[in-house]
Every structure is written in structure tokens, then in C-alpha cells.
Amino acid sequence: MLPYNVRNAGGGSVGGILRRTGQGSGTGSTILGNGNSPGALGAGKVSSSLENHRQPPLELLVFGYACKIFRDDEKAREMDHGKQLIPWMGDVNLKIDRYDVRGALCELAPHEAPPGGYGNRLEYLSAEEQRAEQLCEEERYLFLYNNEEELRLRQEEDLKRLQQETSGGCFSQVGFQYDGQSAASTSIGGSSTATSQLSPNSEESELPFVLPYTLMMAPPLDMQLPETMKQHAIIEKTARFIATQGAQMEILIKAKQANNTQFDFLTQGGHLQPYYRHLLAAIKAAKFPPAPQTPLDQQNTDKEAPSADDHSEEVAGGRRNPNQVVITVPTIKYKPSANCAYTQLISKIKGVPLQAVLQEDESSNPGNSQHSGGTASPALSCRSEGHNSQGGEFTPVLLQYNGSTFTHEEESSNREQQDDNDVNGGEPPQVELLKNTSALALAQNYSSESEEEEDQVQPEKEEEKKPEPVLTFPVPKDSLRHIIDKTATYVIKNGRQFEETLRTKSVDRFSFLLPANEYYPYYLYKVTGDVDAASKEEKTRKAAAVAAALMSKKGLSFGGAAAAVSGSNLDKAPVSFSIRARDDQCPLQHTLPQEASDEETSSNAAGVEHVRPGMPDSVQRAIKQVETQLLARTAGQKGNITASPSCSSPQKEQRQAEERVKDKLAQIAREKLNGMISREKQLQLERKRKALAFLNQIKGEGAIVGSAVPVVGPNPPESAAGAATADSGDESGDSVRSIPITYFGPDDDDEVGEQRPEMRLIGSTQKDEEDDDEEDGGDLEKYNLLNDDSTNTFTSKPVLPPTAAPPPAAVLLSDDDDVQLVATTSTRSSSSRHLKTHRRSRSRSKNVRSSDSSPSSRESSRRRRQKSSRLSREPSSNPPRKSQHSSTQRKKTPKKRRRSKSRSRSKSIRRSRSISILRNNRRSRSRSPSCRNAEQRRQQDRRRTPTKKSHKRHKRRRRSSSP
């Protein structure tokens, strides 16, 4: 047994072969089941052939098991003799295999036919019923004998051929009549007359071939020509298509029409291949233009009418030949409502409200007989008989086509009668203007259900055509005229600036845009619609040139003159953009030449008067001088202009425009100068604020400024200049330079009753000065930056030389070996050192005030004052300055003096260490982290051991302090 899933997938198995059933399996099983009936075998063959034809082949699945086969000759011999068969139903003559399905049947008597055979099994029915049953049997088993799909396709093809034959020879699927079935039935009845009248192509296809008169290349004599005009038409159309589309399309058509005998001329062996090649070459050489298509009515009239004049008279009179083919075209009346999408679209396009559009439609189309906007429809169409007043329904109205125009079916007969009466009466026939139909006309011919149709038809109004103007300039050829017309259309839409763009883009192609071109007048005529536009523009151009020449003689610019000459064309002035700086507050110049109002002039004058008080005297004098020169020049021009009365008004406008421009330029110059001055003043004020803040900080710390010490020696030129600048700075108050400090506060360690003057001589070597300068050199950078006036470009007052010579210098000597020089005035660097030293002395004095009673504190204060005075000197490169200093010295005992010296030595050692640490820190900022670590280790080692320089300084002080 097979597995269950395999049996289900296969749909059953026979001998290990599984069969997948298809759609027709049911029918096949029915046939095989009824195999006992006569003719069942043949029916089975027919059904199998139909199944193979209709359905795809069945999918077969072969499935089996592997088994071993053993050779057993004895068993095979028994099988051949049929020893394995058993009798069926006890009949020894009929033996079956044990696997035979007939073994399941026990009794055959109910299933056997009677001894005489079956008679008519429908004998119990009446004759009509038996006839109906036979028809049902035929329909029931029709699929066994006939293919329904092929039969249905054959019927559809026959129906299409019948429709083509009855529709007048055209290939339209829908006829021009709503009652197409009745027309088809009538045409079937009289097919001979219908085909003769409605199928002219059939007659044309049978016409013999005549060489077309438009073919200017005659074919050779030995070339085989087509037999009929139909073959020629196919060849001609194919040749024209291939000539326009290319040779690739010929290959495609040849592949698609390989089985069509009408396209045998495309193959190499076709007998019409040379004629096709000849037509193709003539079309490519432009020697075979297409023939104009003549309407059918003209052909019929040419055949029947003896002369062309009679035919023209018939067409002009509107008469129709009774034998002429009439084609009826249905039209349905429609009138748009207010909420119609078409009406809303028209209102948006025209830019008018909906009510105006509806009124315009009603006024232009009162009887639905004529349409506005140039759209055409049949002239007398859609009378009220096509409209049903009960439910708003409408019926089609037929129009007759006589070859060139559409007319109403009933009115055509009436018009024929009227034409006959007119001819007999003597009135000349009037030509009726008819328009072509379009989709818009059909849309306007529909009538809405909400409104009733008007029955009265007003006669159409003849439009009066304006006479065409006479062109005095040359008209270009058709190709160039088309380009000029298109360019003029774009220029009208986009403006004359588009003309400038085209002129700069391509001069050769658009040469007609140049005024010197011969077709420029035609171009202007297309743009403006005026024939004399070119002459008018030429006159304007000449007037502008004359004005420019006059202005150049007077020494004026032509910008204002051109604007004055073209006063009527102010809209053509060029657009100018003024690019100015952010700080400049000057107004933009006017693009169009116009007079400035009184408010603007008053505001400008007020602004000028407001700006002037803050300006320096020299700048004000320069501005006044420029203004006087401008006024003198304009006055001279005014005299010259008044002397010439011929061109007074344009030159007056030019003069006024130039005056306004000059005033604005002067105002711009004043504002720029004022802006520069204001920026300098801002920088000055900022420096003042910084200096005042620094002074307030010094005053807040409790510094008391004393009177200056009188100078005892001659000042060098630098000191004298510094003093002069300080005095001038105090007088002007515009800027603060530097503040020299020569006094460091009162002596807190003075003892009452022990004051006595003491003269000392203090001497120092050059090494001490360098050390002191190096100590305080880096700490004074910030203050020097604050008091640096190198960026100040304005000096309020010049430096005055000293009036009186200073007294001779005096040197104060004391019991010490050092020499001390004190200067009343110094440069900016010395003053900064004074300030720094003053801060250090104040900090030290606060620490020492706690021990005022000890004599060592008094000695240390004296040492600090000496050190601060030494720091106030200039660097070693500058020459030394001498000054006079008077102070009170106190006598001390030798024991107290030694203590104070030892303390001062220890303090100086600590101070030198701290200064060296700070200096190394500054140097290590610009180094790498590894270098910084190495520098820190060196500084720690230096803190432990004093430097060699400090040892030398201690030795010198020890020797000087020893008695």
C-alpha cells in the first residue's frame, strides 16, 4: 500500500503511477464508467482529444518502492499456465485474479440486460416529450462533439464582419445613430443599396491603378506596378511612415506582417519591392508630396455636374445634391449651470465672477444656436423638440453632414425649398457662416435640468472684420516669420526685458531684435500691434541722442537727461541697488527722477545741523569749503542754462537732480567723517574709564598721594617731555597717560623725638640693577597695556618744551655705601614699577605694623623704602636720571642695626626664591608637560639651596653693614 499523503497528492494510483487530475477528469471518468453503452469508446477518444486541446497536459508523478527480484523459473511457469487464477462466481470457464475487482460482485442478475435487449426507454413519454428529450440529450453531450470556445469566437468574427459591411465600409465600432439596431436591420434588408451608397472605399479599392500626378519621379518602364489603387495606397502609406520613422520600423513591420500577403512588397523577393523602394526614394527626395484629399461630395458632383462653375454655384447657394451621401451626427443640448465645474473653470480663467460668465453665455448664446469664444457648432442645432418639458430629459437631434458643414435635418429640407424660391423670386442667396464643431461646443449645447430651454432663436450677428493694415516694411519669409511671431508672443507675455535677454544670448539667431535689422519694424508691429511703432521708436531714440549731445556740451551727465527726455516712459527706468556699509545711515537714491518733498529737505537740513556740533573745526571748515565750491559751480551752470531758453526745462530738471545728488554726497561724506571721529572718541573714553577704574582701585586700598618732591638735577629730554605731556593731559582732560607715584605713604615706624636728618650715600653695582629689573619686569605687563597710548591717533595738544632750567642735581650721602636716586617724573614703565612696588611695600608694611615697638621693624621699613626707590629707576639701557630727595633718617644702635640687617637678608633670600619660581613658571607655560615636571624639580632643589647670585648679594650687604 502507498502512504496516505502520497495517495492524496497523486489523486489515486494505478500500478504505482500516480495521476494528478485536472478540470476535465470528471467527464473522463463519466465516460469510462458508461463504457458499456454503444459508442462510448469513440466518445472517450473525442473527449480525450478535446481535453488535450483545451487543457494543459496532466502532471504525472511516478512513485515506487525498491525491491529485490529473485529468479524462480518454476513459479514463472505456473504464472504462464494460469494456475494462480480462480473461478469467478463458481464458473470454471471464467477465471479471474484474486486481486480483480469483479471478485467483490456476488450477483449479476439485477445488472444484466433483458434477453431481448432494451427497447425505446422513452416509450412511456409522448412524441413531443421524446423530441424535447432528444434535443436535451444533444445539448447535454454537445461538448463531446463540438468545441464551444471555437464556436463562440467564430460567431464573434462573423458578427464583426457583418457590422463592417453594414456600417458603410468604415471601421467604427459605434455608429452615428442611437437606433443602430433598426438601422442595421434595414441595412441587412437592402444591403445592395447600402453598400453602394455607404462604402465608397470598396469601390475605390477595386479601381485600377493610376500613377499619381504628384509623383515627380516617373518609375522605369520595366518596373512592375500595383494592380489596384488599394495596393498603391498601402505601399504609399508604408513608405511615408518608414521615411519619417527610420529603417528600424521597416524591420519591425516586416516581422509583424510576415503572414499578411498585402505586405509582401517589404520582402526581398516581392514583385512590388522595386516600386516600394522607388516611392521611398521619391518621398525622401521631396519629389512625392502628399495629394490633397478631395471630399466625397466634390467627387460625386464632379462626376455628375458637367462644369465646375455649376458646382461652385451649388455650394455657394447651399443646395445639396439629392444623390449625395448624408451622414447624421447627433448633438445633445446642454447649458451649464452656476455650480458647474466648467463654468467655475471659465470664471477662473477670465478672472470674472460666475454671474458675469452666465450672463455672457446667455447674451452670446440666447437660443443655443451660436457659441462664444471662437468655438464652433452646427449653426441651427438643437431645437426645443429635443427637450422633454416633463422630467428634463432630452432626445438626440440629428444633424446632416454634406461634406463641409453640419445642418439640421429638418432645416435642410426647408432651406432647399427657400433656395428654390429665392432663385425663382430673384433675391440673391446669402452665404451662411458655419463653424466647425468641437468638444466645447458640445458641452455648451447640453441643457441643465434646473433651467428650461428657450424656444426662440435669434438670427446670428455678422461680425464686422477690421481691415488689415497696409504694411510698408518688408515681411520676412515663412520660417523666419514663424520665429519672429513666437518671439513677439513671449515678449508680450514676459516684457521687454526678455527681449534684452535674447539679444545678449544669441545675436546671430535673433538679429531681428536689433534696430538696424530690416525685419525689426515687423517685429515691433507684432509686439505692439502698431504699424508705425518702428518709426516712433526711431524718433524717440534720435531725441534722446540730441538731448545727450546737449548735456555733454554743458558738462552734465546724461543719466538725468535721458530720464527727462523719456518722461512719458518712466516705467522703463533701470533699477539701481545701493550697497552701503552697515554704519552708514545715508538714504538710498531715488530710482525715478522726482522732486523731493519739503519734509525731506527739512529733515536733511536738521540732520546736518545736528551732526555738525560734534565735529572738529578742521572737518567743518573742509565741508564748508566743498559746499561753497559746489554752490558756485551750480550757480554758474544756472546762469548758462537761463541764457539758453531753447532747452530750459530739461536742463532745469537736470540741475535740480544734480543738486540733490551733490547734497546727498556731501551728507554721506559728513556722516563718514563723523563716524570716524566718533569711533576715535569712543576709544578715548574707553581708555579714560580704564584709568579712572585703576585710580579708584588705588584709592580704595588707602593710598595717600603726597606732594611731589622738587627736582634737584637737570632733567633729560625724555623726562621733560613726559612732564609736559602730563601737564597737557591734566589741562585737556581728554586722555590719561600714566600716573607716576613718588611717595609710598607715611612711615608707620617713626619714633617721636628721634627724628634727625641723615645724609647717606647709597652705591649699587650694575648687577643689582639687572636683578631688580628682572624681578619686576614680567609683573608690569598688564599695567603697561592699560596705559599704552600707541593706538591713539589723536593728540589734543602739542608737547611744550620746559620754560625754566632745572636746578643742579644734589646727591644725598649717608653712612651706607649705596647711592639712591629719586625722580619726580618717569616714563610709563617706571611708573608701572612704582605702582607694583607700592603694592608690595603696603603688603609688607601691614605685616610689620604688628611689631611697631621693636627697633628691627623700623630698620626693615627703612630697608623697604630703599628697595622701592631703587625699583623706580630706569633699565640699564636708558641713561640714569638724578633727582633730589630729602628725608629724615634715624640713628640706631649697632645691636639693633645688626638684627634688622639679618632679618632683611632672610627676607631678601625668600623673595629671590619666589621671584625665580615665578619666572620659571612663566617659562614652563610654553613647554611640554615633561619639561614642566623637570622645571618643578629644579625649582624645589633651588628652594633648598640658595643661588649663587643671592649669596653674593648677602656678602655685599654684610660687608656694607659691618662698622
UniProtKB/Swiss-Prot annotation:
Residues 290-322, 360-430, 445-470, 593-613, 634-662, 716-963 are annotated as: Disordered. SMART domains: DRY_EERY, SWAP. GO terms for molecular function: RNA binding. Residues 768-778 have a biased composition (Acidic residues). Keywords: mRNA processing, mRNA splicing, Nucleus, Phosphoprotein, Repeat, RNA-binding, Transcription, Transcription regulation. Residues 831-847, 861-870, 882-913, 945-963 have a biased composition (Basic residues). This is Protein suppressor of white apricot. The gene is su(w[a]).
